[in-house]
Structure formats: structure tokens, C-alpha cells
Amino acid sequence: MKQPVFTGAAVAIITPMHADGTVNFEELGRIIDDQIAHGTDAIVICGTTGESAALSHEEHVECIRFAVKHTAKRVPVIAGTGSNDTAFAIEISKEAEEAGADALLLVTPYYNKTSQAGLIAHYTAIASAVTLPCIIYNVPSRTGVNLQPATLAELAKLPNVNAVKEASGNISQVADVAALCGEELNIYSGNDDQIVPILSLGGKGVISVLSNVAPQQAHDICAAWFSGDTAKSLELQLKALPLCHALFADVNPIPVKWAMNRLGWNAGPLRLPLVEPSAAVQQSLENEMKAYGVLK
């Protein structure tokens, strides 16, 4: 049995920016503190929601180092270090390990894609270069490649391939992963609207966008489930659905960064090519945050 890196809700945290587009580390620290104070079970730094694709190598490593130092072991810090360049993924994964990260989040190679055999070779090379637990991230809507359950079962044989963040949206596929991998691979939901379905298949929690704006609520969905109150967990999941949908009414992290600014955080601008959400998306976010109770 592989011990999970965390159990519950981990925030896929935004990267706040100054008006000039540089990283706002002071605000990042404030957000981390607030997340931990409101029940977040782990911090995921430099993931999709953190605009990792628009960060320079130096910024990427600096964000990881800052998150590790500022979090100070209060909760695990998971560093997004995936790349479609295996050599670069190894390099930045080693840097994350040296910085003191607790685990790595490794998205499947995108654009150049690859075969299932290539995915096995890619992840084997990274896992062999570090000692940290590796969380594989399957998000075919972004990468253009779907990591098959049988491929995950093969990768789960590697001692430090610890988990998968499953964001395919395909619950049947997640069930197949659970059946094939058993206790050799932990499963996290990569979609806030599928937390309870994945928990019901033995999942250990969620890597969450919702947690940015509602950390306590995302934590509570998972906590209720693990306390045995599955009816309460389902109730909380269903209550969150309209806001979850609003947060994905445009490409992530466009809506959530706007929402964080609206809630009073100095989240700052997006980096191009991402731009502000439409007026319709903004109004939807406004309405759903008020209905959910996170915006007065």
C-alpha cells in the first residue's frame, strides 16, 4: 500500500501577479496562509491554475522555493514539474526536490504527445531521477493524449509513482484505474464536479480549483466523506456544482483569477495569451459566488 501524499482537498493555487506582470510573492504568501487557515490539506504550486506554462524556468523554481519555505511544513507542498520535454521535466523535478517539495505533479506530455509506450518511458525516466512521490496528471482535454488505465497500472509498479490526478472526466476510466491498480496507486479527482464520484471509487481527495475561492468548503466535502457522512459529502458536492461550472465557463485559470480579484485578493492580471473573461462569465461568477456564500 502506498501512503497518499495528502488526503482531502489540495488547492491548485493561483500565481498572483503585480500590475507589471511579475510574480507577487507577498500576496502568494497571504493566500497560502489563508488557505491553510481554512482547511486546505495541501498546496499545489505551479500547476495549470498557477499559469505554469507562462512562467520562466527561473520563476517556476522561485515559486516552488517560496511555497516550500512559506508553508513551512504546515501542509504538503506539491510542485508542478511536468513538461513535454522529458529532460527538462527531470531537471526541474530535481530542482523541486532540492527545494524541499513533498511531491511532484507531472502532467502528460502535450503537443508532441506520444504513444502509451512513450508515456511509460517518460514517467519512468522522471521517477528514476528523483526520490519524491510522483503524482501523474491525466488531462487529455489539454494535452491531446489520454493515459490509459493499463498504462497507469504499469507505471504504478514504480515505487515512487504514488498517485494519479484524474481529470479526464471519464468516471468509467477512473473505475478501471481503481480496479487495475488497487492500493498501488492513489487517485485524486482533477475535477471539482467529480469529487464525490471519485471518492466513491476509493479516491483520496481532489486537487481543486474551487479551493482557491472556497477552501473550507472543498475541504469539508472530503472531510465529510472520510468521517463516514457520505450523505453530507454528497449534499456539499451538489451545492458546489453551480460555482464549479462557473469557474470553468472559460479556460482555467481565467475565471478563478478574476474571482480571486473580485474577492479582494491582489491576484493581478493574467499573462498572455490568457485574457480577462467576458462580461457574461464575470456576471455568472458574481452570481454564483453570492449564491454559494463566498461573496457578500
Feature names for model-found ranges:
Residues 1, 35, 96, 153-156, ...:
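Structural motif
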Residues 2-11, 15-144:
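Active-site beta->alpha loop and helix N-cap motifs at the rims of alpha/beta catalytic domains
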Residues 5-16, 38-40, 200-203, 207-296:
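C-terminal alpha-helical cap/extension of soluble enzyme domains
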Residues 25-32, 149, 282-289:
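Short, amphipathic alpha-helical "lid/cap" segments that border enzyme active or binding sites
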Residues 28, 60, 64, 89, ...:
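A general structural signal for well-ordered alpha-helical segments in protein cores
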Residues 55-58, 91, 116-119, 147-149, ...:
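Short secondary-structure transition/capping segments
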Residues 69-75, 98-100, 130-132, 157-160, ...:
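Short helix-capping segments at alpha-helix termini
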Residues 128-129, 140-248:
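Catalytic alpha/beta core domains of metabolic enzymes, predominantly
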